[in-house]
Amino acid sequence: MTLFRSHLRFLFKPRFLYFQSPTGQSSRPFSTSQILRTALDMPPPPVDTTQRLAKLRELMKQNKVDVYIVPSEDSHQSEYIAPCDGRRAFISGFTGSAGCAIVSMSKAALSTDGRYFSQAAKQLDANWKLLKRGVEGVPTWEEWTAEQAENGKVVGVDPSLITAADARKLSQTLKATGGSLVGIDQNLIDIVWGDERPARPVTTITVQPVELAGKPFEEKVEALRKELATKKRSAMVISAEIYVDDSRLSPEARKQLEGKVVLKPYDAIFQASKVLAESKASASDGAASGKFLLSNKASWSLSLALGGEQNVDEVRSPITDAKAIKNDVELEGFRKCHIRDGAALIEYFAWLENALIKEGAKLDEVDGADKLYEIRKKYDLFVGNSFDTISSTGANGAIIHYKPEKSTCSVIDPKAMYLCDSGGQYKDGTTDTTRTLHFGEPTEFQKKAYALVLKGHISIDNAIFPKGTTGYAIDSFARQHLWREGLDYLHGTGHGVGSFLNVHEGPMGIGSRAQYAEVPLSAKNVLSNEPGYYEDGNFGIRLENLVICKEVETTHKFGDKPFLGFEYITMVPFCQKLLDASLLTEAERKWVNDYHAKVWEKTSPFFEKDELTLNWLKRETQPI
């Protein structure tokens, strides 16, 4: 992935911004056994973690801890991490993006959510117990950890990998069973990993032109200062400092920052924080009674460097809130890049069907993902994938965050469902689209399940709700049709999306977890709309568009509140072979036909000299 992402960590007196290294890629030669497994379409055996666990337990003894926690996240709480930060995957063998590993002197457990139950069951070896998060009767990872820490046992964790809030919560849970939590600055997994641990990737930091960003960074900093002035904490922002490996700065980036911010080495942040805490402690004026304002996503180690809870107020980052409300230039960029990205996906699906059906080609899931990348590269302003493409055939489609690997992936079966979840990073926006296709003859149940998911998708797209409504409140709009049939899906319905930034962005979203009830949806948010259905061991269905939240006109305005709705921006047709018009209402059929007419209008000009793709698009956008 060539995407550059920066996570903004902040505290005040002064403000600090942290630039996180982007995710890198690594490759290694395939063994004979891997080639044989590919040929036979067999899943790989789990990684044998016996020796790794033995080495870790020896280090635990040396550091006087009885239980050790291995989070998924890096020191910036990133969802997508560099290979060198994949500590949980290394120690457990489970490669999904979410989960937590806990190792005691005699047991090991891996907790993950419903997206990864199937994947984890296949990847964990006999040393591990799978804790299925959210399943009745299954303890949370915190509860399981507390059970292992009974009677005065000590639990250790790298304090840079969990937030201060999570550390406090865990500490309270442990106290109930007589355990305690300590931070161990030297990461024990890194020691076990040794020289085999991948190097941290280094990419160039570049400038996003104001023509695409919509607002110069000086205005954003000034808006942040005004926001902070209302917080009345220990000091105002008087300068901006960036802690970064400055060798990564392009000449343009260095020039833009010159005279406006102070550049300091990345690792200097902790010493600088300690100095701030000491200066506050020795202050004789009123500043000593104030607190530092710190992101609630900042690490426990940073909070400790500032003097801990008594010196720090943890809040949701105002930078996170500001990023979630796109400006008009960013919104127009989203619309434009989704037309180009839609054209790329249309070209890919037409190529794939022709290759499988007309040419009889044998293509595996990685071949498909690679071809899609090659097609996207042709389109203007493309920089790279926004995440690893989920190219999944048949049963693999039921693995919600499946990642095909060349050594183990399946050959695409033209007689099975094919789910493709992919996205691009364009200089004018970020895309994330999922379509489920069938190149043969789907079963009646597959068509019914597809219709139920599509109905939920349309229900979200058509939703109108008063300002102040959360994504939690509208999540059931997407699930209601599945619920009537006794079906459901184990993931959120929608997430925020960054503008040439993270494809998953907060603070708002649409889902059934309590977190989605915290922040209301707002005009100029960009979110995904992606209900699904998954039959383990058989197939998966997910239909995802990105939408812009916007104010809508209503006949009345109860309580003088504005009402909000959505504008779809993804331009990719739904699968005609899976569309059964008899399962849709007249209004739903009209929505599909109107959507397909717009897809044709926006994308067909790209294929005036591409008869294959144009014919495919014409067929897939015909009225139902």
UniProtKB/Swiss-Prot annotation:
EC number: 3.4.11.9
Cofactor(s) required, per the database record: Mn(2+)
A Pfam family annotated for this UniProt entry: Peptidase_M24_C
GO CC annotations, alphabetized: cytoplasm
One GO BP annotation of this record: proteolysis
Keyword rRNA-binding included in the entry's annotation: no
InterPro entries on file: Creatin/AminoP/Spt16_N, Creatinase/aminopeptidase-like, Creatinase_N, Pept_M24, Pept_M24B, Peptidase_M24_C, Peptidase_M24B_aminopep-P_CS, X-Pro_aminopeptidase_P
Residues noted as binding Mn(2+) 1 in the record, renumbered to the chain: 432, 530, 544
Cofactor remark: Binds 2 manganese ions per subunit.
Keywords: Aminopeptidase, Hydrolase, Manganese, Metal-binding, Metalloprotease, Protease
Catalytic activity: Release of any N-terminal amino acid, including proline, that is linked to proline, even from a dipeptide or tripeptide
Function: Catalyzes the removal of a penultimate prolyl residue from the N-termini of peptides.
Family recorded in the similarity comment: Belongs to the peptidase M24B family.
Protein name (Swiss-Prot/TrEMBL): Probable Xaa-Pro aminopeptidase P
Upper classification of the organism: Eukaryota, Fungi, Dikarya, Ascomycota, Pezizomycotina
Gene, per the UniProt record: AMPP
